[in-house]
């Protein structure tokens, strides 16, 4: 979500001189807590609200993001099934040869507890509380860098943050893209949400920013950031 909110913040500040948007990328759970406690005007979360989140909050979806399955460019695998992803991350499959690749122990890279990316990944792969990770990292950038540096690694990362240092696998023959995320054929996806506190009135500047990022005016920038804008898709 960092790439999306950064590009939107920069444009909003350019259009509104004197207004500063501060973003702290500390994870979805922290964003939800900040909105609940009032330490932030808006919380940002790359997951939906859960029953055990604080009450009195509203999540407004601004974009949909595909969670890509990534490997090192040297890996000769090109496709993996959703079922096999779950087996890899629960240590039922632990060698690349079991997937048709070159012999070698699979190194599973994932995000920390509280990460919206991890929550979305585990929810869709049905691996919540059962993942066996070799490394648990605190940012998508760290996941990408680690996979890029380890020929036997596999990881998951926001489609919006992908770069050419890693190789993206198709999942059941479908590549993550704006089209496949929007039509639902790419299954590993989650919402980018803005969290507001129902008991608090936003400042004029915060309200203006909220109105902007939830409008169709932000759609092109959201697409440029690699996510799928909801305002456009629902028109």
Residue ranges and their predicted role:
Residues 1-40, 45-235:
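Exported/periplasmic ABC-transporter solute-binding proteins
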């Amino acid at each position: 979500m960092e790439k999306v909110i950064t590009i939107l913040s920069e444009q909003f500040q350019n259009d509104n001189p004197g207004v500063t948007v501060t973003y702290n990328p500390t994870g979805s759970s922290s964003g939800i807590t900040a909105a609940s406690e009032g330490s932030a005007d808006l919380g940002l979360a790359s997951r939906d609200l859960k029953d055990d989140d604080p009450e009195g909050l509203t999540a407004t979806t601004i974009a949909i993001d595909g969670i890509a399955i990534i490997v090192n460019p040297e890996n000769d695998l090109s496709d993996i099934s959703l079922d096999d992803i779950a087996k890899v991350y629960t240590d039922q499959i632990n060698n690349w040869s079991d997937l048709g690749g070159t012999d070698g122990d699979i190194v599973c890279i994932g995000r920390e507890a509280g990460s919206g990316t991890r929550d979305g990944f585990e929810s869709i792969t049905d691996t919540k509380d059962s993942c066996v990770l070799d490394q648990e990292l605190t940012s998508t950038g760290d996941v990408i860098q680690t996979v890029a540096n380890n020929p036997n690694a596999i990881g998951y990362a926001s489609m919006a943050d992908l770069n050419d240092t890693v190789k993206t696998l198709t999942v059941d023959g479908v590549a993550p893209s704006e089209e496949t995320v929007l039509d639902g054929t790419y299954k590993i996806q989650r919402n980018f949400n803005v969290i507001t506190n129902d008991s608090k009135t936003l400042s004029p500047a915060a309200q203006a920013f909220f109105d902007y990022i939830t409008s169709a005016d932000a759609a092109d920038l959201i697409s440029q950031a690699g996510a799928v804008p909801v305002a456009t898709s629902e028109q």
